[in-house]
């Protein structure tokens, strides 16, 4: 299939997905976590992936691309320690080391928060590319927490990805939005432009309830596969 489907809670999929990524990684690997709509658990998934990799001994940084609506710092409990942010680094107002926040509970995990006050247009392909290139020299994995949908921040996060987790709920509208994201991943990435190996895609189903599937209240795996033609 073009995408691997994981119908497990986010804390279980490390076994299935991160093992594959870790085994193949030689250079810094860029992982994007995205979704077609908000409220599906995307940022929680980003934090879980980053923490999982860091706890396995991989030096990992997770970047919040959601300019103006950041909450990755809240989930990781470092919101009071934010001094500089992603946009400050892109604009040359701070160095990467000044903006990075080291997780208090995991020495291998760092956070680069989004700006809460800047406009999304402050993100540029050139600026994001330079920051990712610099981080690649210091880290094993770069996890990009993308905004939902296809806004500028999301497109930039997707563009540089090596691996992508598309997070969705087992609802028709959410799954169809995910289909659109899979299309963007296959056609608008740096890998696609360079005719390189395609981004490795994972479709993560959150809020999956087997009892509700049996009662017909929720889409099942077969339904999702049919909608996405997987």
Role assignments for model-derived ranges:
Residues 30-93:
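Walker A/P-loop NTP-binding active-site region of P-loop NTPases
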Residues 42, 46, 124, 128, ...:
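Short, conserved glycine- and acidic-residue-centered signature motifs
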Residues 22, 65-137:
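P-loop/Walker-type NTP enzyme "switch/lid" segment
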Residues 35, 64, 113-116, 168, ...:
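Flexible glycine-/small-residue-rich
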Residues 136-137, 141, 147-230:
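Conserved catalytic-core segment of NTP-binding enzymes
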Residues 59-61, 108-111, 142, 164, ...:
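Structural motif
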Residues 3-37, 58, 98:
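Extreme N-terminal, non-catalytic leader segments
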Residues 38, 89, 112, 145, ...:
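Residue-level signature of catalytic and energy-coupling elements of molecular machines
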């Amino acid at each position: 299939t073009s995408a691997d489907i994981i119908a497990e809670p986010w804390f279980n999929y490390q076994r299935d997905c991160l093992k594959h990524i870790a085994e193949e990684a030689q250079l810094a690997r860029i992982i994007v976590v995205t979704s077609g709509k908000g409220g599906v658990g995307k940022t929680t998934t980003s934090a879980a992936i980053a923490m999982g990799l860091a706890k396995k001994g991989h030096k990992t940084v997770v970047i919040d691309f959601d300019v103006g609506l950041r909450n990755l710092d809240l989930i990781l409990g470092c919101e009071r320690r934010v001094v500089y942010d992603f946009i400050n680094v892109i604009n040359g107002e701070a160095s990467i080391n000044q903006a990075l926040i080291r997780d208090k509970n995991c020495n291998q995990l760092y956070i680069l928060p989004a700006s809460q006050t800047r406009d999304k247009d402050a993100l540029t392909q050139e600026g994001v590319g330079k920051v990712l290139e610099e981080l690649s020299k210091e880290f094993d994995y770069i996890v990009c927490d993308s905004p939902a949908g296809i806004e500028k921040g999301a497109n930039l996060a997707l563009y540089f990805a090596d691996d992508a987790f598309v997070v969705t709920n087992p609802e028709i509208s959410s799954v169809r939005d995910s289909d659109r994201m899979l299309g963007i991943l296959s056609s608008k990435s740096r890998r696609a432009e360079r005719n390189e190996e395609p981004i490795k895609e994972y479709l993560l189903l959150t809020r999956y309830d087997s009892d509700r599937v049996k009662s017909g209240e929720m889409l099942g795996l077969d339904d999702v596969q049919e909608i996405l033609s997987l």
